[in-house]
């Protein structure tokens, strides 16, 4: 059974994201003094006592302004409310009741979802009750004075929330979801892909660059296995970003890469690979994440039977360090090949977690040596590769034991990695190779002996 959902509703800059961070004991929601920082609806795990629930944070609601993407924000709030068990409408106790609060309350009174009023910014316990009393006029029941920053009053509020949630049932323990981060430059179609995958508008889609500021987690199931999809803010050159909510969104995007199992790097088919795309690809490789390259907006490209292989060759030439990643040409607009993303991502994760026996590794290395011997130095010393073994997964990592790592240049090291890939597979995941020489092995053995004596 899915966890019940608590929707956070309110006008801009009343402290919704601060309250979400308080309820979920995290700093996932972006907090900034500028109104309207949260645009999409974002989900986090919350708990109180022995109950667990989902908290959905929505964009600031405005009913009398249709500029930019405010209509889409209102639609996101509608969708959040439709799936919620309880709605928390957040108001500003220091400002008192505003016309916007009254408009939101009028709308909420038409909804079937039970609603509670949380009067935020009531830092003073004595004044808080007086400030909250004004909000009885909204017609939504008893207002709860709280301070989202300090936590005052949130316990009473949560007790009331739990009383409105559906009865608790024994739930089987869920499988750990596969974490998939959807990353890319602004306006390459990340949110459109997320919406196409989910079959509903989970993220605001707009031609305005940088529409998504939060990382948006979406849970869904494919072939009996849970997934968590993370749509990130578009990542730009650092010098082009001000130190505001967009800057924090970009930092959140890099953290999303770190906590992901697989990254979907979205490339704009019309723009091709940019320098920023290359930097993102480098970040994925440095962090050792599995990857699928998605070339979006393929429907907008004039093409014939030769176009796809030609474009793939051009793109791979600029993303040569991700030559192990599968490339997929999609259109979020038409849905073309969107479902294939899951199959490729699942395969990449499987390879990312895979382990191979030492005997199989050495069979591949033996064949590689028979085709091409290690190089010889100017002094006449030839490199010797004795054996190898896999020492880790996520990503697959191998230690190769040699006479002297300095005798193995980059060209031969790349050759060995290619042979391991050809012999063992590992499509969609980076490999890490560690080259260890005799002196290093001897030092490690001596250290182990000393530790055994001390033990």
From Swiss-Prot:
KH-like domain span: 354-439
UniProt keyword Repeat present: yes
Binding site for GTP 1: 10-17, 57-61, 120-123
Biological process terms in GO annotation: ribosome biogenesis
Protein residues bound to GTP 2: 184-191, 231-235, 296-299
UniProt xrefs under CDD domains: EngA1, EngA2
Residue span, EngA-type G domain: 4-169, 178-353
Similarity annotation: Belongs to the TRAFAC class TrmE-Era-EngA-EngB-Septin-like GTPase superfamily. EngA (Der) GTPase family.
Protein name, entry field: GTPase Der
Lineage: Bacteria, Bacillati, Cyanobacteriota, Cyanophyceae, Synechococcales
């Amino acid at each position: 059974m899915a966890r019940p959902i608590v929707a956070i509703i309110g006008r801009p800059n009343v402290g919704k994201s601060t309250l979400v961070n308080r309820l979920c004991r995290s700093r996932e929601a972006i907090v900034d003094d500028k109104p309207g920082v949260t645009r999409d609806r974002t989900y986090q795990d919350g708990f109180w006592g022995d109950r667990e629930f989902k908290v959905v944070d929505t964009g600031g609601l405005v009913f009398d302004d249709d500029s930019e993407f405010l209509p889409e924000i209102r639609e996101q709030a509608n969708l959040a409310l439709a799936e919620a068990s309880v709605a928390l409408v957040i108001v500003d106790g220091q400002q008192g009741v505003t016309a916007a609060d009254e408009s939101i309350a009028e709308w909420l009174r038409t909804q079937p979802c039970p609603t509670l009023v949380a009067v935020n910014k009531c830092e003073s316990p004595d004044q808080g009750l007086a400030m909250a009393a004004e909000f009885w006029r909204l017609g939504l029941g008893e207002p709860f004075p709280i301070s989202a920053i300090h936590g005052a009053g949130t316990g009473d509020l949560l007790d009331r929330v739990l009383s409105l949630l559906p009865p608790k049932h024994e739930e089987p323990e869920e499988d750990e979801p596969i974490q998939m981060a959807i990353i890319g430059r602004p306006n390459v179609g990340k949110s459109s892909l997320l919406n196409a995958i989910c079959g509903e508008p989970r993220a605001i889609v707009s031609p305005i660059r940088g529409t998504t500021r939060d990382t948006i987690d979406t849970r869904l199931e494919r072939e009996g296995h849970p997934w968590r999809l993370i749509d990130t803010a578009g990542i730009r050159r650092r010098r082009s970003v001000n130190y505001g909510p967009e800057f924090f969104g970009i930092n959140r995007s890099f953290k999303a890469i770190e906590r992901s199992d697989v990254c979907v790097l979205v490339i704009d088919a019309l723009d091709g690979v940019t320098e920023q795309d290359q930097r993102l690809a480098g970040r994925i490789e440095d962090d050792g994440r599995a990857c699928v390259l998605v070339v979006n907006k393929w429907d907008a490209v004039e093409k014939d039977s030769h176009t796809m292989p030609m474009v793939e060759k051009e793109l791979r030439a600029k993303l040569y360090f991700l030559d192990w990643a599968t490339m997929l040409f999609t259109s979020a607009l038409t849905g073309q090949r969107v479902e294939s993303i899951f199959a490729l991502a699942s395969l990449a994760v499987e390879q990312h977690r895979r382990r191979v026996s030492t005997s199989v590794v050495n069979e591949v290395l033996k064949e590689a040596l028979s085709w091409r011997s290690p190089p010889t130095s100017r002094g006449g010393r030839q490199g010797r590769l004795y054996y190898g073994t896999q020492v880790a997964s996520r990503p697959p990592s191998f230690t190769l034991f040699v006479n002297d790592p300095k005798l193995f240049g980059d060209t031969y090291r790349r050759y060995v990695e290619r042979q391991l890939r050809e012999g063992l597979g590992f499509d969609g995941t980076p490999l890490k190779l560690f080259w260890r020489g005799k002196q290093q092995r001897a030092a490690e053995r001596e250290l182990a002996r000393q530790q055994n004596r001390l033990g």
